[in-house]
Swiss-Prot record:
Record's keyword terms, sorted: ATP-binding, Helicase, Hydrolase, Nucleotide-binding
InterPro entries the UniProt entry points to: AEP_C962R, Helicase_SF3_DNA-vir, P-loop_NTPase, Phage/plasmid_primase_P4_C, PriCT_2, Viral_Helicase-Primase_Cplx
Keyword match Nucleotide-binding: yes
Claim: Signal is one of the keywords in the record: no
Name the record gives this protein: Putative helicase 184R
Domain SF3 helicase residues, every copy: 624-807
Residue segments, region Disordered: 506-528
One Pfam match: AEP_C962R
GO molecular function: ATP binding; helicase activity; hydrolase activity, acting on acid anhydrides
Amino acid sequence: MTDVFKVLTPAKNINGEHTHVSMGDTKGTWYLSLNKSQEFYNVYGLALKNGQKLSLAEKPGEYVPLLVDIDLKKEVNGYPNYGSNDFYNDEDIINVVKIFQNAVSENVNRHAKKLTNKNLRCVVLEKDIFIERINESEDKYIVKKGIHLHFPHLFLPKKDIKNSFMPVVKTMIDQENVFQDFINSMDNQIMPSSLIDDISSKYWLMYGSSKEGLNKPYKISKILDHNQQEISISKCFKSETCIDGSPITDTNVEFELPMLLSINPKPSIISNKLFYFKEAPVKLCDALLPVVNNNREKEGRMSSREIEKMKKLTSFLSVSRADDYNQWWTVGITLFNIGTGRDCEEEALEAWKMFSSQSTKYDESRCDLEWAEMKKKNRPLNARTMGSLIFMAKSDNPVALEKYLLAEQMNIENWTSHQNLDVESIKKLKVPVFDTEIAEMFVSQHEDEYLNGNLGWFKFNGTIWSSLESVGRHMRPSLVSLSRSYLNLIPALKYITKTLQNDDEGYEPSDSGFGFDDDDSASTSGGKTTAEITKLVNSKIKLINDLAKKCQNNGPQMSLMKVIEDMIGIDNLNDKMDQNKQLIAFTNGVYDLSLFTFRQGLPEDYITRQMTIPYDITLTMENPKVIKMLNFFKKIFPDEELFEYFMLENCEMYIGGNRDKILQIWTGEGDNGKSVTNKIIENKFGKLSVKFPKGMVTGDPPKAGACFPELTRAQRGVRWAVVDEFAPDETVNAGVIKNLTGGIDNLYARDIQQKGKDVIDIDPFFKLIFICNTIPNIRNPDNATWNRIRVIPFESTFKDSIDDISLEEQKRDKIFLKDTSFCEKETIRELGEAFAWYLIQVFIKKEQARRDARLNGKSFKIKIPAKVNEATELYKAQGNAIADYFNDKFEISDDDNDTINIKLYYQDFLLWFSQTHSNKNVNIDKKKFMKLFVQHAKGDMNTFICTKLKLKETLEEFNLENNEENGMPLF
């Protein structure tokens, strides 16, 4: 299959985007570009014709042909001698096809497009019976027969097939009792629908391909028309064309089958065969269906001037945006929201097509297809509007945009010099007079650039909204620039009057030097006398000079900024900023975790904090930076299972919230990499990470409305919160743990300067991490507390020298040479960049698995390594150890003379714990033991004496007096 791979592009070269996956000896994912389709199918067809084994599968897109997998298998005693007819008969296949055709006819929406008989044609594909011995010791076999149904002329939305259509069809199949002979031959009775699988979301083997090993490909056994009558292959595809555009014939149709049966053909082919379902006949898993909002408010239809502005702004966008799918789609969804929100959808789609046509990849039907999907969801993404277009245009073509916006605001066009400014332009020229007019012009020119509210002033820097200490320092230059743009018109205005004066016979200037005498009978221009035109020009010049005074003097500037503040101010800005859990900002853009897309930041993201590193889209698993980072973490976690778990758990750090409600406790002796690991994470997060004081989790939670400044630091999108350096005798509050690791209710806090009524409602975005050598005990834990805790052991040790340690000992004890470069700022930053990229890749795979599980109605959980479970269980045992020891050894007494001196029982406690916990050692020192025991027994904290307490009578006495002599010190 070497020649086939030469045509395809390895997915790793284009950031993982792929259309095909190899299921044979050569593993990998690949991308087929449209401009190489003809070459690919020719090479693939020739390889198939020459008998080469092929193992390529296609990745399904958002729209797929209706595909059905019928999986017949059963267990038999003795080697079977089966043929196809022993499994099913033709009537079974015909009945199943008929059920699907009827279901399509009843449930497909016919309003937009007519459903024809051709759309109902079904290709039946089969492969030979496969026999597999269960094990060598028994003479039992599994017999399998695979059948695929493929409707090549009918494309449908993938998720609707899974969520709405297949459940309905399966019900119909059970009612018809198909495959009854096969079911009756089985030991266990099953429902017919259990034989039918929906594979719309799975990779689909190309025609002629098979999996590795002895597997054979599926072949066409028959094709059924809309009446379930057999037709020839050439008749089925008669109206199609070959990959080179020539017509399908009896002689070439076999060669073209891999292309004709592709589940991911050209967008133009999908568009012609695409249908949508009516409203689902059965509401299944409503939470999984797309949210549809058919009542979106519209602002009223755009004026023709605004539509032209939309098209003009789109024309300023860079061609590179049209070549990059993510940016191309962002432009599309922006125009879609403008079009549907302002009742100019047709014009918005036209603007998108004009923009897209600049790319060599342009396919008009692809625009129609994507637009139809946006319309079906009818859900604006971050409510992108004209401001987003302006921002993108400003990034791509700032000079042209500035000239255009200025000309638009002045109500003149194409002014580049005095020659372009004629009398008509002077009459149309708008010069703002009042503060409100100037402010409106400023806001229009700087749309979505400034923001003001209860959090202060912000300016959009291209990625996030940056907080401004002094808004005047930023606005004043813009106001001055606005006035100078008008002042630059004065020479052109004067040129007009000068030209008229030179043309006027007997002209004499007035005393003012600007106008004409009242009795001037000069020539006319455009129906007006020279005097009238000069008067008009002078009035415009006066207005411009007045504007300049307001924009360039401090007092009027302050007044203007106050008006601008009122115009762009947003109430409760705190409720908007940093509230999207799916967005995380890097220094060079924003990653959208819901779409697995890295893109340019937009004003409507409302992000005010970003990480300190860029997201490097050029990284691959073979990049030296990534290899170095992985080598570092594999020394931290030499155990492969522990390494994978650490990555799977922490790839969630970028998404806001703690949806799995996990508290990670990193523990281990010193010099094992905990601090360096956390330093890498904190360094890349910057202001998105906080360090909580220990008292926040060891003390009681504050009362409602009380001052709690520590928690207020964790608002505004903070993703990472750490508590470290616990003392051995400190105890953590279980209630605080549950509050901070995510629950139904938000957290409430008040900063030092805030009034009680200004309490902040905090939706925690952070993951909570404890870092400690000795794990603190938990006060009054319940099952909900323990279910949240994951103790992650850092097993390695990093030493300054390992010369005297054998290689065997190093490997066994996980000892490594300490690399001091990991403490250097540049190394930490480099590791952070690679780590950030790698975790995003892990997150994508994990999230896709989570979504697939949700669609199938299953729960999703990652496997917890045995070492984490053991460490967590040991911690739990230690947390309950005092109470268990107390209950095992002691009992309450009514006699005041019954006393217990806790100092004497520490060694007995250690022995008891070892005996009751499989010889494990408890991580509780004597001081901590005495304190916890006295607390539990309600004894005297000064003397460590507990009254009305005695040993249980069933226990044998032991010699406490001689403990010290026997090497068991009391202190």
